[in-house]
Amino acid sequence: MGPVSLLPKYQKLNTWNGDLAKMTHLQAGLSPETIEKARLELNENPDVLHQDIQQVRDMIITRPDIGFLRTDDAFILRFLRARKFHQADAFRLLAQYFQYRQLNLDMFKNFKADDPGIKRALIDGFPGVLENRDHYGRKILLLFAANWDQSRNSFTDILRAILLSLEVLIEDPELQINGFILIIDWSNFSFKQASKLTPSILKLAIEGLQDSFPARFGGVHFVNQPWYIHALYTLIKPFLKDKTRKRIFLHGNNLNSLHQLIHPEFLPSEFGGTLPPYDMGTWARTLLGPDYSDENDYTHTSYNAMHVKHTSSNLERECSPKLMKRSQSVVEAGTLKHEEKGENENTQPLLALD
């Protein structure tokens, strides 16, 4: 018997019969591991990639009620990847993407980072985006719920900032394949704040993220959630697909369960990770550019200038000269407790974004 290969499945590229040589320009820039992952998990085949895209494009004529404002190959490809190359499902998602924008025109007026409402939300850390990806290549987004100052930011503007951020991030083909993780820290999120999460705005968020955006969400993780966040499930359940209810995890203050799914080396110290505390202004500086400055020293690490430029080419390089400080009501490093497995087990799936 020959030696047993110990390579991960995504590194066994020699089993692909030379398909890497057939890679189209639409796969250019992807790592070999990601190309293999797309083949195994998403059914992506470079031999028929252009045909798959064209078949989705040919379906557009069936929805004359929708204005499909973008139909180029690279754009349609992200919808195919989000639906594992099921063409009918990919087209349905594409149609819902533009229909959502038609039905919510006010949300997408001046849809750029220097819009006053979006800018305020970004500066306040909605969303946070970690620089490094996790062990599966997924981008990690953070929401510190208690930082929601309702006199400063409307929920709609926070949602707009999240959607704009996803638009920028999804330009990266690696993230189209590997996807995203969302962690929501509910520490000190008050009942009064929660009372503003009405069914109508929750429905708006679910429709925008679950039903109308071409992103693969590998999990949504709740940390330090109070009892009334559990109660929100009864509000959002009617709006959720059955398959999406499996990917949100309620960790409470149990870091062990979180770390079983996301390794500590990829997490900031607020979540028991080995990274420094998260700087709330990091992602705002990335989108708003080098003119976002403050009196304190910081290292400005741009995400990927090409992707930001593609989506936000008309951004003005301006921002108020202040550094967002984490709300005192938000959990600080070391607040969350490590618990033995089996104690206060609180990680039952609740909901997820597909």
Curated annotation (Swiss-Prot):
Superkingdom of origin: Eukaryota
Question: According to the UniProt entry, which residue ranges have a biased composition of type Polar residues?
Answer: 345-354
Membrane topology, as annotated, equals:
Peripheral membrane protein
Question: Which CDD domains does the record cross-reference, listed alphabetically?
Answer: SEC14
Molecular-function GO terms, alphabetical: phosphatidylinositol bisphosphate binding; phosphatidylinositol-3,5-bisphosphate binding
What tissue expression does the UniProt record report for this protein?
Answer: Expressed mainly in the brain.
Q: Which UniProt keywords apply?
A: Cytoplasmic vesicle, Endosome, Golgi apparatus, Lipid-binding, Membrane
Q: Which GO terms describe its cellular component?
A: clathrin-coated vesicle; early endosome membrane; endosome; trans-Golgi network; trans-Golgi network membrane
The record places domain CRAL-TRIO at 118-279
Show the InterPro entries listed in the entry: CRAL-TRIO_dom, CRAL-TRIO_dom_sf, CRAL/TRIO_N_dom, CRAL/TRIO_N_dom_sf
GO biological process: any one? lysosome organization
- Cite any additional comment in the entry: Binding to PtdIns(3,5)P2 is not required for localization.
Q: Which PANTHER family match?
A: ALPHA-TOCOPHEROL TRANSFER PROTEIN-RELATED, CLAVESIN-1
- Record's protein name: Clavesin-1
The record's gene field reads CLVS1
